[in-house]
Amino acid sequence: MVEKNTYFIGVGRRKTAVATVKLTSGNGVIVIDGKPIEERFTRVQERNVILNPMMVTDTMGKYNAVIKVLGGGVAGQSGAIAHGIARALEKSDDKLRATLKSNGLLTRDDRTKERKKPGLKRARKAPQYTKR
């Protein structure tokens, strides 16, 4: 466990979202942009993505998290927060690194939206082919 006044910062990214996570020892309160997690992310799937690093490392209820997240949508933001929490947990205890790494939580998911190409309607969708 960590001392009272120490904190660990982790920056997570997913798609265009960037999350800064500040972990302190506590009782499991998670505040995202000044709101509790239940108010900020209403769907259970997104909350499960966010809490996954803590569930895997069995640190639920041991840390409080204050999170600032910018950019992206709901899925990108929840992924960025999970990545940030995983990085902060790794800084708090080196023994957790193996568990986080084996579950793929320290790897930055670099899948982003593919750019639109000229002559196409979207990234890959071509206009309808006409024979004559």
From Swiss-Prot:
<dbReference type="InterPro" id="IPR020574">
    <property type="entry name" value="Ribosomal_uS9_CS"/>
</dbReference>
<dbReference type="GO" id="GO:0003735">
    <property type="term" value="F:structural constituent of ribosome"/>
</dbReference>
<dbReference type="GO" id="GO:0022627">
    <property type="term" value="C:cytosolic small ribosomal subunit"/>
</dbReference>
<keyword id="KW-0687">Ribonucleoprotein</keyword>
<keyword id="KW-0689">Ribosomal protein</keyword>
<dbReference type="InterPro" id="IPR020568">
    <property type="entry name" value="Ribosomal_Su5_D2-typ_SF"/>
</dbReference>
<dbReference type="InterPro" id="IPR023035">
    <property type="entry name" value="Ribosomal_uS9_bac/plastid"/>
</dbReference>
<dbReference type="InterPro" id="IPR000754">
    <property type="entry name" value="Ribosomal_uS9"/>
</dbReference>
<feature type="compositionally biased region" description="Basic residues">
    <location>
        <begin position="114"/>
        <end position="132"/>
    </location>
</feature>
<dbReference type="GO" id="GO:0006412">
    <property type="term" value="P:translation"/>
</dbReference>
<dbReference type="GO" id="GO:0003723">
    <property type="term" value="F:RNA binding"/>
</dbReference>
<protein>
    <recommendedName>
        <fullName>Small ribosomal subunit protein uS9</fullName>
    </recommendedName>
</protein>
<comment type="similarity">
    <text>Belongs to the universal ribosomal protein uS9 family.</text>
</comment>
<dbReference type="Pfam" id="PF00380">
    <property type="entry name" value="Ribosomal_S9"/>
</dbReference>
<feature type="region of interest" description="Disordered">
    <location>
        <begin position="100"/>
        <end position="132"/>
    </location>
</feature>
<dbReference type="InterPro" id="IPR014721">
    <property type="entry name" value="Ribsml_uS5_D2-typ_fold_subgr"/>
</dbReference>
